[in-house]
C-alpha cells in the first residue's frame, strides 16, 4: 500500500441507516492509525469484526481495540453505560485482549443509569399502547440519557470523582424520573422488566442501589478517565494518525435523518469534532461506508424496500445471504435495492471524500440489480432524498436496471479480478453519487478488502 501521511486523521461514517460494516473497515484502517475515537452514540451501536475466522461484537469500545498497541478513546459525545462497558471489557479480556491500559474515557461523557433504559422501554410501549408507530429504539436508554444532557441535568463521568456531588444530583434526577415512570405504570402500558428489579422497591427506582453500583464503577473507571480532548490534540501534534469511528448511520442522525425515526445523536462527520473535542480542521478525510444494497432496522420510511421475507425474491436473497440480523438487538433488518439518491444526501451532509462499498459478495448470483437514481414525489422528479419522514414515505423510486453476475466475488482483493458486471455496478454508483470509490469489502474477513485509494495516503 501507499505510505501513510504522518499526522493524518480519517473519519468513518455510515451513509445509510447503520449496519453498513463500519467495524471491519475501522479495524482494517487502524493498521495505519495510532488512536481510534468513538464520538457519539452509546451501546446501541453494534460493530462485528471477523479476524482470522473469529467473530467479535463490540458495542461501546472502539473497534481499534483489536489492534495491539492502538489507543482507544471514548469522546464526550458518547453516552456511557458503565455497567455495559465493563461487560464488554471483561469479554475482551477473556479473549486475551488488553483493554484497560489502552482505553481513555472523557470525563464529560453523560452517564446512562438503570432508569434510563426503563424510560426508553416505557415510551416505546406507550406509543404502541396509544396506537402510534414505534420509533424502533434499542431500549438501551440512549435517548433518555441524551435528553438529560440537553436539559443540563445529566450526571457525567466527572461527577463520579465527587461522591457527595454525585449523590445530590442523583437524588434530583431520581425524583424526576420516578415520577415519570409511575405515570407509565399507572397507565397500564408498561411493566418494569427483570433487568430493573435489583434497583426497585415499592414501585420506585431506589437511590441506594443506583448510587452504590455507581460508586463501584467509579473506582474501576478512575484509571481510564481522561481529558480526551487534550490527549487527542497532543497526539495529533506529535504526529499520530487518528481514526474517528462513527456509529449508526447518516439517515439515523437526529438532524439529517428520517426524523422522527432516528437516533438521539448526530451521526454525521461534523460531529467527530464536537463529540471528541478537536477542531474541524483536524478532520482530513471522510470515508463513507455503504452496503452494496440497503438495510434498515425498526420503523420509518425506506423507499427501496423489497419483500425480504418471501423465499426466491431478491430481498430474501439479501436477507439470508447477508445474514441481516442486528448485532445489538437481534432484530431482522429490512432489505432493499441500493439507493444512490439517498447516498447523494449523505455525501452532501458529510462532505464525503471517498466511499467504501461493503457486502458486494452478497449480490453474487442475482440475475439483475436495480439502482435507485431518484424519485417521483407528488408528481415531480427529484434526484436527492428529501428531508422529513412524511415526504420520504411518499417517494416512488426511479430505477435503473443493471445486469448481475454469477461468479463469486468472495475474498477478491484486486479490482480487476471482479466480474465485469460487478465493476459496472460499482462504477455506476460512483457516477450517480459523484463520490469516488476508495475501498470495497468482499467478505466480513479483515483481509478481504480491495483498496483503490488509501484514506491515510490520499493527498
UniProtKB/Swiss-Prot annotation:
Binding site for IMP: 19-22, 44-47, 138, 152, 248, 263, 331
Residues the entry annotates as binding Mg(2+): 19, 46
Organismal lineage: Bacteria, Pseudomonadati, Pseudomonadota, Betaproteobacteria, Burkholderiales
Reactions accelerated catalytically: IMP + L-aspartate + GTP = N(6)-(1,2-dicarboxyethyl)-AMP + GDP + phosphate + 2 H(+)
SMART domains (alphabetical): Adenylsucc_synt (SM00788)
Active site: 19, 47
SS bond partners: none
Residues engaged in binding substrate: 327-333
Name listed for the protein in its UniProt record: Adenylosuccinate synthetase
GO cellular component: cytoplasm
Domain of life: Bacteria
Xref: Pfam families: Adenylsucc_synt (PF00709)
Function according to Swiss-Prot or TrEMBL: Plays an important role in the de novo pathway of purine nucleotide biosynthesis. Catalyzes the first committed step in the biosynthesis of AMP from IMP.
UniProt pathway annotation: Purine metabolism; AMP biosynthesis via de novo pathway; AMP from IMP: step 1/2
SUPFAM superfamilies: P-loop containing nucleoside triphosphate hydrolases
Amino acid at each position: 500500500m501507499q505510505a501513510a501521511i504522518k499526522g493524518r486523521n480519517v473519519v468513518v461514517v455510515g451513509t445509510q441507516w447503520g449496519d453498513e460494516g463500519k467495524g471491519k473497515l475501522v479495524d482494517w484502517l487502524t493498521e495505519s492509525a495510532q488512536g481510534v475515537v468513538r464520538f457519539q452514540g452509546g451501546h446501541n451501536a453494534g460493530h462485528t469484526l471477523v479476524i482470522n475466522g473469529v467473530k467479535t461484537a463490540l458495542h461501546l469500545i472502539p473497534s481499534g481495540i483489536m489492534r495491539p498497541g492502538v489507543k482507544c478513546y471514548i469522546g464526550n459525545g458518547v453516552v456511557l453505560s458503565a455497567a455495559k462497558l465493563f461487560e464488554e471489557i471483561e469479554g475482551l479480556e477473556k479473549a486475551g485482549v488488553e483493554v484497560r491500559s489502552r482505553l481513555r474515557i472523557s470525563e464529560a461523557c453523560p452517564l446512562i443509569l438503570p432508569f434510563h433504559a426503563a424510560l426508553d422501554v416505557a415510551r416505546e410501549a406507550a406509543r404502541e399502547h396509544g396506537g402510534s408507530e414505534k420509533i424502533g429504539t434499542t431500549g438501551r436508554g440512549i435517548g433518555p440519557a441524551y435528553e438529560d444532557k440537553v436539559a443540563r441535568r445529566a450526571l457525567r463521568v466527572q461527577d463520579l470523582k465527587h461522591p457527595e456531588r454525585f449523590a445530590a444530583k442523583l437524588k434530583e434526577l431520581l425524583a424526576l424520573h420516578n415520577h415519570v415512570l409511575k405515570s407509565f405504570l399507572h397507565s397500564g402500558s408498561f411493566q418494569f422488566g427483570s433487568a430493573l428489579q435489583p434497583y426497585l422497591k415499592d414501585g420506585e427506582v431506589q437511590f441506594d442501589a443506583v448510587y452504590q453500583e455507581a460508586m463501584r464503577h467509579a473506582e474501576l473507571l478512575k484509571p481510564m478517565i481522561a481529558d480526551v480532548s487534550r490527549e487527542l490534540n497532543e497526539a495529533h501534534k506529535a504526529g499520530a494518525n487518528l481514526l474517528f469511528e462513527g456509529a449508526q448511520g447518516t439517515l439515523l442522525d437526529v438532524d439529517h435523518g428520517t426524523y422522527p425515526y432516528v437516533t438521539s445523536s448526530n451521526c454525521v462527520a461534523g460531529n467527530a469534532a464536537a463529540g471528541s473535542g478537536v477542531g474541524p480542521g483536524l478532520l482530513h478525510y471522510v470515508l463513507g461506508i455503504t452496503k452494496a444494497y440497503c438495510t434498515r432496522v425498526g420503523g420509518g420510511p425506506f423507499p427501496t424496500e423489497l419483500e425480504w421475507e418471501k423465499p426466491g425474491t431478491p430481498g430474501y436473497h439479501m436477507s439470508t445471504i447477508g445474514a441481516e440480523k442486528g448485532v445489538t438487538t437481534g432484530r431482522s433488518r429490512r432489505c432493499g435495492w441500493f439507493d444512490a439518491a439517498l447516498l447523494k444526501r449523505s455525501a452532501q451532509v458529510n462532505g464525503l471524500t471517498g466511499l467504501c462499498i461493503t457486502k458486494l459478495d452478497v449480490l453474487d448470483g442475482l440475475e439483475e440489480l436495480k439502482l435507485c437514481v431518484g424519485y417521483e414525489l407528488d408528481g415531480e422528479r427529484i434526484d436527492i432524498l428529501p428531508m422529513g419522514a412524511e415526504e420520504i414515505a411518499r417517494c416512488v423510486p426511479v430505477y435503473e436496471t443493471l445486469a448481475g453476475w454469477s461468479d463469486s466475488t468472495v475474498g477478491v482483493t484486486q479490482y480487476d479480478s471482479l466480474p465485469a458486471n460487478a465493476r459496472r455496478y460499482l462504477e455506476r454508483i460512483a457516477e450517480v453519487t459523484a463520490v469516488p470509490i476508495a475501498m470495497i469489502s468482499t467478505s466480513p474477513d479483515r483481509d478481504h478488502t480491495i483498496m483503490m485509494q488509501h484514506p491515510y495516503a490520499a493527498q
